[in-house]
Amino acid sequence: MESSASTSASTSTADVVVIGGGPGGYVAAIRAAQLGLSTVCVEMDKTLGGTCVNVGCIPSKALLSSSEHFEFAKHAAAAHGIGIGQLSLDLSTMLKRKDDVVAQNTKGIEFLFRKHKITWAKGFGTLKPGNVVEVTTGGGGGAGGPPAQKIATYQAKNVIIATGSVPIQLPFLKFDERRILSNVGALTIPQVPKHLIVIGGGIIGLELGSVWSRLGAKVTVIELLPAILPGMDDDVVREADRILRKQGLEIRIGTRVTNGGLTDTGVFVEVDKAGATERIEGDHVLVSVGRKPATSGIDVAALGLNVGKRGEILVDDRMRTNLPNVYAIGDCVPGPMLAHKASDEGVVAAEVIAGKPSRMHYKSIPGVVYTWPEIASVGLTERQVKESGREYRTGRFPFSANGRARSMGDAVGFVKMVADARTDELLGVHMLGPNVSELIAEIVLAFEYRGSSEDIGVTVHAHPTLSEVTKEAALATLGRSLHI
């Protein structure tokens, strides 16, 4: 496809204008530019990378890693013959390291934009009828901010909406990012709190709760549902709950938060469990009850854009909306709000625009929880398979029977497989254990090719490695596990 870009006195044209520079948007822009399309990416933040790189995936993993080192030094180093002496924590250095990691990543994205000659339009993008994108200062002049000033206007041959998501607030706990925190504020607490209250026992709540727990905070996790980690396999949830409690997290399930606010020294929440009410006070409260699509620059009614009940933009497996030459990707479309999903959707959108036969495969998107031990999964849970009426069999193998896990001192958790009883096709794989975020990739590849447990079981895995647990779980599914 021939690239074309021109500029008039008031309007520039481009083959592709991407609204949003997060993991979906910036990847879409890079792929579009690789395919020879003149590309503009509109991003209002000072740095590219969106929530994931700036205040999500990357900084949280930096803190998780630092806190795991601290935990090792405090509790496990002696068993390896390593004497630490008097252990101390320099939180300001830890937070600076986190910021440095983020800066390295954002600067890397800027370099890639320069390399591929992508125009970064620094401002707030608004999609107008006819695929016109206006770029203004600030957040579009809303929410009591200064009036928006137009920076640029683009006539786009194709538009990719990649506006991401925002955390959901509770009506009585509005984010101030000092005491009442979203994921953003939870990454910058200036000193280890004595008591951190976490509302929501999902991925964000447990990951960030684990960080501050390891660093010395009392952490209380309050979950409305009967179990933490909604949507995960029941066996994984039970074991994760047990391990996290053993690590020191106070987990309250089946508990509703009915009220909350600030005190003179911190915060309070009021909770109700089966009619019994209680007031809990702490230094900070992290509200992690989910996220919602962010589409403030997209007037869906005026545009005639089809959206779902949560405001998510409806698309097909080629990321096409109901409007001609308008695509949408990432957290603002249906499906799990995952950075890797957004990135792959960005690639698909760019390739479809370029005329390639690309489409998304939603069946094989992995999910990871970066607690310790880690949790990873792909496909259906055993409960989902059972409820479908499909005949199946399962196999399970523990890390406690794996030589590498024992040599590392991290022999907890297991790998569990669910396979079709007749065809042996893998239907779901669920992992809890050391470094399973890396082990799940093998299974995702098998899912792409509708692989079987036997495909995994007959594949030679290096010894001694953690990946042997995956092989043994596959063999267990076939009834012939070797080491248990």
Where do the protein language model's features map onto the residues?
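Glycine-rich flavin
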Residues: E2-T7, T11-A14, I30-V192, T220, ...
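Beta1/beta-strand and adjacent pyrophosphate-binding region of the FAD-binding site
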Residues: S10-G22, V192-G202
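Gly/Ala-rich phosphate-binding loop of Rossmann-like dinucleotide-binding domains
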Residues: A29, A33, G209, S213-R214
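FAD-site-proximal beta/loop scaffold in flavoenzymes
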Residues: D176-P193, R279-I353
